[in-house]
Amino acid sequence: MNSALVYRIETKNGDGLYIDDIGILDSPTKKTEGAPSHRPFPQRNLQNFLFDRTTDRKSYIFGFRTKKQATNWIKNPQDFEFLSKNYVLSLYHVDDKYITEDKNQLVFNITKAKLIKQYPLKNIQPFGFHTIIDKFKNIFNFISRSNLSNV
């Protein structure tokens, strides 16, 4: 069975950038409506056809594992500045069978994921939007090398 490291921007309590991940995933429309809160949120809609009718969506939450998916969470430096005050970059280890994704977005089953570590976003010092994403990429690479042997 293959596994992956999945990242999520969330509070220390596990609350993400969406008001209601479950409500979005259970949307009856072809695309999720993406009910935003006052906080920034991933702009791309996740196609519901990625789930079959038997999938229990109640345990699935949004995350990312690629640079392209990460850019849907942070659109500009102002988003990052807001997020860095209250949010952490959480790292989860998840078996591939509990991950559903397309090129722009990812959801994973939080009940089947193992929290590896949380990094305060305020400790990441970017100098511009592309630097933020590049720093994430560097963190991803470092974490992957140092943590996969411990999982």
Region spans (language model):
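Conserved aromatic
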Residues: F64-R65
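Conserved NAD+-utilizing ADP-ribose enzyme module
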Residues: M1-N45, T55-S59, K68-V151
